[in-house]
Amino acid sequence: MLQSNEYFSGKVKSIGFTSSSTGRASVGVMAEGEYAFSTAAPEEMTVVSGALNVLLPGETEWKVYAAGEVFNVPGQSEFHLQVAEPTSYLCRYL
């Protein structure tokens, strides 16, 4: 079953799903802006197109992840994103 989600007044939209190859996941698109997300479980984020400037929990420096790159976010944490252009992603819930 697909589940549609919308955050930050429609600037971030995702579709959640479960499959045998990825497990529980969501795909989505972020418009330009700055966002903070909280996690319940650990997440693996893959940038599909565009780029994300990311500040991970416990870090003091931002890091840019471009299309094809992956970063991991611990569970029970918050991470920050800066998005300069519309960017798509795949989020796997680990």
Curated annotation (Swiss-Prot):
It comes from the Bacteria. One of its GO terms (cellular component) is cytosol. GO terms for molecular function: guanosine phosphorylase activity; purine-nucleoside phosphorylase activity; thymidine phosphorylase activity; uridine phosphorylase activity. It holds the Pfam family Ppnp. Its EC number is 2.4.2.1, 2.4.2.2. Keywords: Glycosyltransferase, Transferase. NCBIfam families: PRK10579.1. Belongs to the nucleoside phosphorylase PpnP family. PANTHER family: PYRIMIDINE/PURINE NUCLEOSIDE PHOSPHORYLASE, PYRIMIDINE_PURINE NUCLEOSIDE PHOSPHORYLASE. HAMAP family: Nucleos_phosphorylase_PpnP. Catalyzes the phosphorolysis of diverse nucleosides, yielding D-ribose 1-phosphate and the respective free bases. Can use uridine, adenosine, guanosine, cytidine, thymidine, inosine and xanthosine as substrates. Also catalyzes the reverse reactions. This is Pyrimidine/purine nucleoside phosphorylase. It comes from Citrobacter koseri (strain ATCC BAA-895 / CDC 4225-83 / SGSC4696). The gene is ppnP.
